[in-house]
């Protein structure tokens, strides 16, 4: 079932306009002009909610509205960073915008053109750039690096008597730990310390906040900021959020809080064993003994405040015959039930060169794993 409401385009346009930036203002004018052709948009919300961890989504005119800067946000250096960047911002947002009170909408305020200008270097041609101007130095320690990698917007809507309206915004700021560049045709890189990254991120967040608040419709809208530290290209764990803050009004953020997150890749290398790593090592050993031709068995464990919040196990196999996949999935299920943590959500993904072959999910209420084999 879906709830169906009608939302005036002019009202929506006033909400999503961004007078602080000429490009967004122009986009808003185009949206207003298009309302002459149609007086209303049909906005629907899904009534089914998979769990309290998920937001119900809004659908406009029967279609899911993608993020206005979607093309720009796909440019982080690894898929692991991109995944953590997007899902981590939702995790931060839940504490400010409860899932039982707010609906999720992909960002509709900051468009791709504006994002591209903001994440570029500041210059005479691009005064809105949030990265420092090129100082002409090409040495790793002397050049002005690209600090800001990406900006992600998520909108959180509330339901009123007759429609939906903007209830809050979350802005993710992805910052580089390593800036990759080319010098005389050769690959080079500049490492960025955590201290410098945080200093730059706070300044960038305040600038973005000021630009958003210049729009009357956004002066009193709560805006959550999350600072994400993007890891290097060879890190398969991916980055994490390191800072968060919420601005209720005004143009300065003064209430930054540290976010204690980390991603640990298993098996560990030269590190002290943990409860999760020991359980995984027992699981890995037994699975590989049963199927010695596996290409690899690894895991990623996400921690929040030093507590394991999720484990994702990846098993790569060289074979993909149906009988072999079934046998492997059955054995992995048995071993997972025997060794893997019972108090932490765990997923097991079995893949081959053709893609995912089987998927195991732990039923937390029963403490057992179930599996699905893909055709």
Please give the residue ranges for each predicted region.
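Bacterial signal peptide processing site
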Residues: 22-25
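Hydrophilic extracytoplasmic domains
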Residues: 271-375
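A solvent-exposed, charged loop/short amphipathic helix patch at secondary-structure junctions
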Residues: 179-196
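Bacterial N-terminal signal peptides that target proteins for export
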Residues: 1-9
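Extended, H/D-rich, highly charged conserved domains that either
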Residues: 211-222, 235-237
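N-proximal, solvent-exposed amphipathic alpha-helical segments enriched in charged/polar residues
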Residues: 32-180, 198, 202-204, 232-303
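Short, non-transmembrane amphipathic alpha-helical segments
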Residues: 191-217, 323-345
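C-terminal motif of bacterial Sec signal peptides marking the signal peptidase cleavage site
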Residues: 17-20
């Amino acid at each position: 079932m879906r709830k169906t409401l009608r939302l005036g385009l002019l009202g929506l346009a006033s909400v999503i306009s961004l007078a602080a930036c000429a490009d967004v203002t122009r986009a808003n004018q185009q949206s207003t002009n298009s309302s002459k052709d149609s007086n209303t948009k049909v906005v629907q919300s899904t009534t089914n909610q998979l769990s309290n961890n998920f937001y119900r989504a809004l659908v406009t005119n029967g279609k899911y509205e993608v993020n206005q800067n979607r093309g720009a946000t796909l440019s982080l250096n690894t898929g692991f960073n991109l995944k953590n960047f997007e899902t981590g911002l939702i995790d931060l947002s839940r504490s400010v915008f409860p899932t039982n009170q707010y609906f999720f909408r992909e960002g509709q305020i900051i468009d791709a053109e504006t994002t591209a200008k903001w994440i570029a270097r500041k210059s005479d041609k691009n005064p809105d750039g949030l990265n420092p101007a090129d100082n002409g130095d090409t040495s790793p320690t002397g050049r002005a690096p690209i600090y800001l990698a990406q900006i992600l917007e998520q909108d959180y809507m509330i339901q009123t008597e007759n429609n939906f309206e903007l209830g809050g915004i979350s802005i993710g700021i992805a910052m580089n730990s390593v800036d990759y560049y080319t010098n005389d045709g050769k690959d080079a890189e500049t490492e960025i310390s955590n201290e410098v990254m945080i200093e730059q991120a706070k300044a960038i967040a305040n600038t973005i906040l000021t630009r958003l608040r210049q729009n009357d419709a956004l002066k009193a809208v709560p805006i959550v900021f999350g600072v994400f530290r993007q890891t290097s290209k060879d890190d398969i764990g991916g980055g994490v959020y390191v800072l968060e803050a919420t601005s209720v009004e005004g143009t300065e953020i003064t209430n930054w809080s540290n976010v204690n997150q980390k991603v640990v890749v298993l098996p560990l290398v030269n590190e002290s064993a943990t409860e999760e790593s020991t359980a995984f090592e027992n699981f890995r050993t037994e699975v590989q003994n049963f199927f010695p031709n596996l290409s690899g068995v690894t895991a990623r464990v996400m921690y929040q405040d030093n507590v394991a919040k999720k484990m994702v196990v990846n098993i790569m196999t060289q074979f993909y015959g149906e009988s072999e996949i079934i046998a492997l999935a059955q054995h992995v299920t048995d071993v997972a039930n025997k060794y893997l943590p019972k108090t932490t959500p765990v997923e097991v993904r079995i893949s081959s060169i053709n893609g995912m072959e089987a998927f195991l999910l732990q039923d937390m209420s029963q403490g057992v794993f179930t599996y699905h084999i893909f055709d």
